[in-house]
Amino acid sequence: MKKVLIAYDSRTGKTEKMAESIAEGIRMAGQQAEIKKITQIKNEAELQGYDAYVFGSPTYHRDLIGTMKTFLFLAQKANLEGKMGGAFGSYTHSGDAPTIIFDTMEHVFKMKMTNLGSFNLKEALVDGTEGLRACQDYGKSICDQLG
């Protein structure tokens, strides 16, 4: 069984709901999902032992929230090169944060990224059936690529 870490932060609870639904999709695919708020991760050693990493942040002012920026500096020290990665987040006006995370994971961390790209979802859609199903599908697809 593969082990996937979903590390996220959320201000309104929407990105947290996305994280939970992505984890459901991973579990539906028969893999293990662990969800952690990035503020709970204190050192790079806590990022070891996973087969894939999915990082999530809402978008504010076309950017990541500050806690995600700090977390990415921590994650860079964890040597995640070659691991499977994905990124997600909620947004109101622009969905730039997941793309920034995805690009950082791919180009700075040298991770093997999901061929789905980053996944963003308008906040108004997060609570709906289709939005939650899309999150589950993202989780399942990451597992499909893990093998």
Regions found by a protein language model. Name each.
Residues 12-16:
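Glycine-rich NAD(P) Rossmann-fold beta1-alpha1 loop
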Residues 8-10, 89:
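Short beta-strand/turn micro-motifs composed of small residues
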Residues 2-3, 17, 23-29, 34, ...:
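FMN-binding flavodoxin-like domain, especially the glycine-rich phosphate-binding loop
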Residues 43-47:
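Short amphipathic alpha-helix with an adjacent loop that forms part of the alpha/beta core around
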Residues 10, 38-42:
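Short beta->alpha linker loops
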